[in-house]
From Swiss-Prot:
Pathway membership: Amino-acid biosynthesis; L-arginine biosynthesis; carbamoyl phosphate from bicarbonate: step 1/1; Pyrimidine metabolism; UMP biosynthesis via de novo pathway; (S)-dihydroorotate from bicarbonate: step 1/3
Gene that specifies this protein: carA
Entries under HAMAP family matching the protein: CPSase_S_chain
GO MF entry, a single one: ATP binding
Domain Glutamine amidotransferase type-1 stretches: 168-348
Name of the protein described by the UniProt record: Carbamoyl phosphate synthase small chain
This protein's UniProt keywords: Amino-acid biosynthesis, Arginine biosynthesis, ATP-binding, Glutamine amidotransferase, Ligase, Nucleotide-binding, Pyrimidine biosynthesis
Catalysed reactions, semicolon-separated: hydrogencarbonate + L-glutamine + 2 ATP + H2O = carbamoyl phosphate + L-glutamate + 2 ADP + phosphate + 2 H(+)
EC number per UniProt: 6.3.5.5
């Protein structure tokens, strides 16, 4: 079945359609990860986006439910060069084509993804449709103008989860990955709270953590979270990962900006000036270095100098994903350092 990728710059690319027959729309971005396709597709940070896999071969190993980062696929569609759509079923009991059909996710195969990635790198992220009919797609609204966090979070409200640690963390869930929650529970007990919760009404916690998530960190719907963090700077230890770093930086008075094509993949090197860490990234926004105030920039991306870690006396946040999944475990020390700082603050 022929299917088309229609982009906001007027490009129309024909390919083979699989997955759901629905029309998909979103911001067109790419990942350079060569493995972890199911983890990427179920990562809530991809809400509102169509994901191009730079790796030419996708779905060449079985689908395993245990690696899913949320209950459902979160991307708006996928673009592949050579997808093994009829790969024998894994623990999900489905081949790739049937899995995407059941999830309501459209996909297009046979695309020159190398050319498409170069196009995005040179011109910046695009907006795109995946559709069976190439005609009638002239409206390309900005998905980042939506409240994507509301679509990314699987559970609303406040929930207590007992972990292996005694210290309790107020975990502000903006679209967290399962692996991240699991790693946090290895060190702490969590008070899970969605962004629309009354955060000021929650008490009896030792530190605050802000999770990853999708969209524009300066979206009006997130202003209550930013203001809550402002009120707690210097009061409670504050930690964050990925989107969480950007939210924390806004609370400190810094600004964020939209990157040309972002960082998405499991092979991004960052440095603190002494050591180099290979890390997993998934972000299309970053902190404006000209607006840094009241905190120290500890790590930067080796390739483009993007701010990748910030800290002050009671705050620490990274732009990358130390929990990885997929990706390297070079920076899992972040969780131990969180625990140490939380313990020190609790002891006064």
């Amino acid at each position: 079945m022929k299917r088309y990728l229609i982009t906001s710059d007027g490009t129309v690319i024909a390919g083979y359609g699989y997955g759901s027959p629905v029309t998909g729309y979103g911001e067109l971005v790419f990942t350079t990860s060569m493995t972890g396709y199911l983890e990427s597709m179920t990562d809530p940070s991809y809400v509102g986006q169509i994901l191009v896999f730079a790796s030419p071969t996708i779905a060449n190993y079985e689908l395993r439910k245990g690696v899913m980062e949320s209950d459902r696929v979160k991307v708006s569609g996928i673009v592949t060069r050579d997808a093994h759509i009829n790969m024998p079923a894994g623990t999900l009991g489905l081949d790739f084509d049937r899995f995407l059909r059941d999830e309501g996710i459209p996909a297009i195969d046979g695309v020159d993804t190398r050319l498409l990635v170069r196009k995005i790198r040179q011109g910046g992220v695009l907006r795109a449709y995946i559709a069976d009919d190439p005609q009638g797609h002239s409206d390309f609204p900005d998905p980042m103008s939506e409240n994507l966090v509301a679509r990314a979070v699987d559970a609303r409200g406040v929930k207590n989860i007992r972990g292996k640690g005694e210290r309790r963390i107020l975990f502000i869930d903006l679209g967290s990955k399962k692996t991240l929650r699991d790693m946090m529970l290895e060190h702490f007990s969590l008070i899970m709270a969605s962004a629309d919760s009354d955060l000021d009404a929650i008490d009896k916690y030792d530190a605050i953590f802000v999770s990853n998530g999708p969209g524009d960190p300066d979206h009006p719907s997130l202003r209550p979270v930013v203001n809550f963090l402002k009120r707690n700077i210097g009061v409670k230890p504050i930690f964050g990962i990925c989107f969480g770093l950007q939210i924390i930086a806004l609370a400190y008075g810094s600004k964020t900006y939209k990157m040309k094509f972002g960082h998405r993949g499991s092979n991004h090197a960052v440095t603190d000036g002494n050591r180099i860490y290979v890390t997993t990234h998934n972000h299309g926004y970053a902190v404006d270095p000209d607006t840094v105030r009241d905190f120290h920039v500890r790590e930067r991306d080796i390739n483009d100098g993007t701010i990748e870690m910030i800290e002050d006396g009671m705050m620490m946040a990274v732009q990358y994903h130390p929990e990885a999944s997929p990706g390297p475990h070079d920076t899992r020390w972040f969780f131990s350092e969180m625990r140490r700082r939380t313990e020190d603050a609790a002891k006064g």
